[in-house]
């Protein structure tokens, strides 16, 4: 047989093996009995079924009463478990019965700081490679919940906020379990380097004392990302925290600041193409800086309050956005999200934020989609601008008192041309 024919035959065998594996898995799932209601008859597995269900969630395991959550569905099964167990496990089936439950009690507890399609990271730990289609189990905080555990997606969790248990086996992430519905208290803002997400070099300083991963540093000391992260693996994070009331600055190697300082913590993260800089800041403080970046101080106080509510609603709506999850951030500081300039805060905007603390807009019990623009001729648009279907509250309307004039029909005058040239610079 020629070498080319051997290669072809080997490829066919590998493909055939993959098809058989998928077929067995589908048969296992199809033979399970879904629970559809209180009065539904409990069925068992087909007696001919044998195999393994990986990373399922055991809801109940008592003699002849085993309930399993697997791939988003709840199933009944028969068997005699060695002991009661609730949690993530591999389940062995033999002739339709549960013959073995391989518990996975090894977990890492902490805050979810980043994730991608291939890895998951918990605060204080290096990223771990993850199972494909990593299962995420959301456990209700109330013991009286109608659905005590449901299967969700990793995007249901909030980077920098969600407290989770990462189930680990053989140094690999097998599943994520979250025991609470997270209301984000902090925002992680990616501080972009122009259009880039990374910096080739990165220095941080402060006019006050500060700490680097808990180690005290004197004021005016420059922290060099390269020195701290040299030799570390991709994904390694270092948290820099100012003393109470202090600010942190991105600076050059001599300690000369670039622009204004940041409240909250700065997180330096090593990536393949350089370093990422993230500002972790309490939600309300973030809104304090967004508000004057998005609306002039000269606007009416009620308008400032309304903008604060819009900004807060928009931010909460973006917390589960996975665009920057791999960098451990929720959003960035550009106008692609909201303008976030760490400039001096102002009393009037600070008060507008304080007077609306925690307030958001909802529609039918869910956060409203808040879209707003910097400049308007008095006519609003709906979501067609973003090639999306518009909800009932986003309408294209004329917001002027009088009918909008068609300015395209007005003749240009020397005066209007001069005004335009001055405005254009």
Each model region followed by its residue ranges:
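Conserved, single-site charged/polar hotspot
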Residues: 2-425
């Amino acid at each position: 047989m020629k070498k080319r024919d051997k290669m072809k035959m080997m490829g066919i065998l590998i493909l055939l093996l993959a098809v058989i594996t998928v077929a067995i898995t589908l048969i296992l799932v199809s033979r399970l009995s879904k629970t559809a209601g209180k009065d539904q008859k409990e069925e068992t597995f087909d007696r001919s079924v044998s195999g393994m269900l990986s990373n399922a969630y055991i809801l109940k395991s008592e003699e002849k009463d085993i309930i399993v959550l697997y791939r988003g569905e709840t199933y009944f099964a028969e068997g005699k478990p060695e002991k009661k167990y609730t949690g993530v496990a591999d389940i062995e089936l033999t002739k339709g019965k549960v013959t073995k439950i391989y518990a996975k009690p090894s977990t890492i507890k902490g805050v979810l700081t980043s994730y991608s399609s291939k890895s998951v990271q918990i605060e204080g730990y290096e990223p771990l490679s993850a199972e494909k289609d990593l299962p995420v189990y959301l456990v209700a905080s109330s013991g009286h919940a109608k659905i005590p555990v449901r299967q969700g997606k990793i995007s249901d969790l909030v980077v920098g906020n969600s407290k989770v248990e990462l189930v680990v086996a053989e140094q690999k992430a097998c599943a994520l379990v979250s025991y609470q519905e997270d209301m984000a208290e902090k925002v992680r803002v990616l501080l972009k380097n122009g259009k880039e997400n990374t910096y080739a070099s990165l220095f941080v300083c402060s006019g006050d004392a500060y700490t680097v991963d808990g180690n005290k540093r004197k004021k005016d000391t420059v922290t060099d990302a390269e020195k701290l992260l040299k030799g570390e693996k991709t994904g390694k994070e270092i948290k820099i925290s100012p003393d109470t009331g202090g600010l942190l600055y991105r600076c050059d190697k001599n300690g000369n600041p670039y622009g204004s300082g940041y409240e909250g913590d700065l997180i330096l993260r090593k990536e393949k193409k350089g370093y990422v800089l993230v500002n972790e800041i309490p939600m309300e403080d973030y809104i304090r800086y967004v508000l004057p970046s998005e609306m002039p101080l000269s606007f009416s106080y009620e308008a400032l309050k309304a903008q604060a509510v819009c900004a807060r609603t928009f931010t909460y709506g973006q917390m589960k956005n996975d665009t920057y999850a791999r960098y451990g951030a929720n959003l960035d500081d550009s106008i692609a999200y909201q303008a976030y300039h760490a400039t001096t805060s102002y009393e009037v905007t600070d008060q507008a934020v304080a007077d609306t603390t925690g307030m958001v807009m909802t529609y039918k019990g869910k956060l409203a989609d808040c879209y707003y623009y910097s400049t308007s001729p008095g006519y609003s648009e709906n979501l067609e601008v973003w090639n999306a279907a518009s909800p009932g509250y986003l309408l294209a309307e004329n917001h002027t008192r009088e009918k909008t004039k068609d300015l395209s029909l007005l003749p240009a005058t020397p005066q209007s041309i001069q005004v335009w040239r001055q405005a254009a610079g």
